[in-house]
Amino acid sequence: MAQMTMVQAITDALRIELKNDPNVLIFGEDVGVNGGVFRATEGLQAEFGEDRVFDTPLAESGIGGLAIGLALQGFRPVPEIQFFGFVYEVMDSICGQMARIRYRTGGRYHMPITIRSPFGGGVHTPELHSDSLEGLVAQQPGLKVVIPSTPYDAKGLLISAIRDNDPVIFLEHLKLYRSFRQEVPEGEYTIPIGKADIKREGKDITIIAYGAMVHESLKAAAELEKEGISAEVVDLRTVQPLDIETIIGSVEKTGRAIVVQEAQRQAGIAANVVAEINERAILSLEAPVLRVAAPDTVYPFAQAESVWLPNFKDVIETAKKVMNF
């Protein structure tokens, strides 16, 4: 075991897969010589060569098209979109092509592409560097969308994503890259895509979250415990497909739930989770399922970021509303 930050765990996963499979290729803006803007690919070009880890022009649409072509030729591309706010430039490649080629060809061709991309707020970056746009891609059939909250999860899920024969969007929260360390196995291991994780056991209310909001939820749960409220925290880890079994099992146990996301409230992952709970566990509920989310505005300037982003206080307030219903 080694103490790793999330970005170190990601680099470790990439190194393992480059060693394991000669068809794995890593490319994107600045990922080669400079090792990525956040150094997630640092040292990989020197170790594996310019044919395996290489830089691209500043053109997300080109990165997406290259990934599709390489996948059709039998490679296992791992492109990086430098910030997920720039995903608009490559949406046709992702949703119009990658997600559909297996279906269009009757399963004759696969798209073993893992798109890595930093996202999320809390580090005072401009809006296109901070947006949480996971809802855009989670809606598209044929894609898997993974959002880890810990170094351990990041490494195991990234290895699983690279080995998957379908396209995976692997989103890495900026705030979590170096915010803490965790013991991570030094060898290879996998975590199943589509499997949530109960990060804290509880009996009174279920708090469902993903990404950086898992840590806000855990902080809220610790505060709620002081007031006699036992909160269970479920980390989705994968937002498409959802782990319905774990979600419903927890809600049926506690009878109450809130869903927490960093993204804007409208048409988000949280709304989808709430709908699934209402459709499958309505008779187990003691109160309505509520959401914690950002306002439905464009991501603000850095000066207003702290009041715009959801935090543990919002989680506590919403949990108490449900408990007092």
Curated annotation (Swiss-Prot):
> Which domain of life, per UniProt?
Bacteria
**Record: residues binding thiamine diphosphate:** E60
User: Which proteins does it associate with, and in what oligomeric form?
Assistant: Heterodimer of an alpha and a beta chain.
Per UniProt, the keywords (alphabetical) are: Oxidoreductase, Pyruvate, Thiamine pyrophosphate
What is the name of the gene encoding this protein? pdhB
EC number(s) from the headed UniProt entry: 1.2.4.1
Q: Which reaction(s) does its UniProt entry say it catalyses?
A: N(6)-[(R)-lipoyl]-L-lysyl-[protein] + pyruvate + H(+) = N(6)-[(R)-S(8)-acetyldihydrolipoyl]-L-lysyl-[protein] + CO2
**Any keyword Oxidoreductase?**
yes
Functional description taken from the UniProt entry: The pyruvate dehydrogenase complex catalyzes the overall conversion of pyruvate to acetyl-CoA and CO(2). It contains multiple copies of three enzymatic components: pyruvate dehydrogenase (E1), dihydrolipoamide acetyltransferase (E2) and lipoamide dehydrogenase (E3).
Which InterPro entries does the record associate with it? Answer: THDP-binding, Transketo_C/PFOR_II, Transketolase-like_Pyr-bd, Transketolase_C
Q: Which GO terms describe its molecular function?
A: pyruvate dehydrogenase (acetyl-transferring) activity
Q: Where are the transmembrane segments?
A: none
Keyword flag Methyltransferase: no
Organism, as annotated: Geobacillus stearothermophilus
Tell me what this protein is called: Pyruvate dehydrogenase E1 component subunit beta
Cofactor(s) needed by this chain: thiamine diphosphate
